[in-house]
């Protein structure tokens, strides 16, 4: 690839001491070499920051390490990463996931080959301590209507032109966007006339366990509804469409955690995606 724009990989890290090395190593192993990794520790109480510092000391020219004075949640943390980023392109990454070695190479090539596209995501594999159990396939050409029935992009997989974050002023650091900062981003992304696409190839592995489901609390679902109301108004969706979201929120709130875990385990055993 002749033209190699710099990619800033932004990663908020919090209490991920046991998985962080694997995440960072997957970036170090990228076939695309013009990148910087920006880590921001969000007030971890384990050895996460110390481990990140070791990597920073070993790769001082490629890794930038920041630290919040206290736990400020993901939106604030990612905005700090964006402030430090110097790349033309911005990639997301989580501290407990894995990027395939050719992820950046293929996503950069896609953006360079599609100048009308400002963001590209990809399919991703879900895995746990037992191994990979399914692949999540995205809509390859999502638009603003996609948000009505599913997410247009898997947040941690995206590579974005810097102009997107500059135009949107980063992530919304408000209570209503807590744990749904990605959904808020998609609403504002489409409201500003941007276009995105997905590569239907798994270039990213996302780690899932019992804590992943437990974190999807009633409060986070309520925040999702608040953000949905905001987004539907922003994009001019009919008010009646909100009824579907309200009913979905009620249904999810009354289903107990054990039932959700049983359903997910059953899907894994049946090989369903």
Residues covered by each model-derived region:
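N-proximal low-complexity "stem/linker" segments adjacent to membrane-targeting elements
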Residues: 1-28
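Short loop->beta transition adjacent to catalytic acidic/histidine clusters or analogous donor-positioning motifs
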Residues: 4-7, 28-39, 47, 61-64
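Glycine-rich, basic loop-to-helix element that forms the pyrophosphate-binding segment
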Residues: 68-85, 106
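Conserved nucleotide-sugar donor-binding catalytic segment
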Residues: 83, 143-218
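Short aromatic/hydrophobic "clamp" motif used to bind/position activated sugar donors
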Residues: 90
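Conserved donor NDP-sugar-binding/catalytic core segment of glycosyltransferases
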Residues: 102-134
């Amino acid at each position: 690839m002749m033209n190699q724009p710099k990619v800033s990989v932004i990663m908020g890290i919090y209490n991920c001491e046991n998985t962080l090395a694997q995440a960072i190593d997957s970036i170090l192993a990228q076939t695309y070499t013009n990148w910087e990794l920006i880590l921001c520790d969000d007030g971890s109480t384990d050895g996460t920051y110390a481990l990140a510092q070791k990597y920073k000391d070993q790769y001082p020219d490629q890794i930038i390490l920041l630290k919040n004075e206290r736990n400020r949640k993901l939106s604030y943390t990612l905005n700090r990463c964006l402030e430090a980023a110097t790349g033309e392109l911005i990639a997301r990454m989580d501290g407990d996931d894995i990027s395939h070695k050719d992820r950046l190479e293929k996503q950069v090539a896609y953006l360079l080959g599609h100048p009308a596209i400002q963001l590209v995501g990809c399919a991703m594999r879900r895995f746990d301590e037992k191994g990979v159990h399914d692949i999540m396939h995205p809509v390859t050409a999502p638009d603003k209507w996609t948000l009505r029935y599913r997410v247009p992009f898997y947040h941690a997989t995206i590579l974005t032109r810097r102009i997107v974050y500059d135009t949107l002023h980063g992530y919304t650091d408000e209570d209503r966007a807590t744990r749904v900062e990605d959904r808020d981003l998609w609403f504002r992304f489409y409201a500003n006339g941007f276009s995105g696409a997905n590569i239907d190839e798994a270039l990213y592995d996302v780690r899932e366990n019992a804590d992943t489901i437990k974190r999807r609390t009633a409060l986070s679902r309520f925040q999702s509804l608040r953000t949905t109301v905001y987004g539907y108004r922003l994009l001019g969706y009919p008010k009646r469409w909100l009824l579907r979201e309200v009913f979905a929120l009620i249904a999810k709130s009354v289903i107990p955690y054990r039932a959700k875990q049983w359903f997910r385990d059953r899907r894994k055993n049946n090989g369903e995606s």
